[in-house]
């Protein structure tokens, strides 16, 4: 079934098209949901809600001529997942209480004592576990900017906060992720038999 047939079939409520859409995208989006969520339970709730919302918005793809269908589905899913996480008020709260000042040079290095870890060349289970350990605001910002390649302006708009707050949160997320990965690597190396 071609992409056009898939989209058309989904509009017509065709069960075969719906099943193919589900089979094609569900596992990809499930992993994205895991990255944005703190655990499997929250991920499942976000996945089910966001997946159904993406499915209901497929008709909006027609006007999106510069984006591939896969990217459209992924970006819409991320948008709904982020909004779901933001909707958990007892967990997600970001407030900018200090006016950020932009410096042209850094006078410190968060990673002075350790090698910076490339997130694309690390064990994905270890990375997922470490990302899920971040506080929600850091988890969202890190996923948006580093893994999903959103621009600073896009992340700022989606999270409804200033670009300076996003930069600050990203720096904290990188630091905390680095430390979490280092700790998880130490734990896993101690657990392996010699």
Predicted regions and their residues:
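Residue-level preference for hydrophobic side chains embedded in well-ordered alpha helices
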Residues: 21, 25, 29, 50, ...
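Residue-level signal for the short linker/turn that defines the boundary of a DNA-recognition helix
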Residues: 16, 27, 38, 67, ...
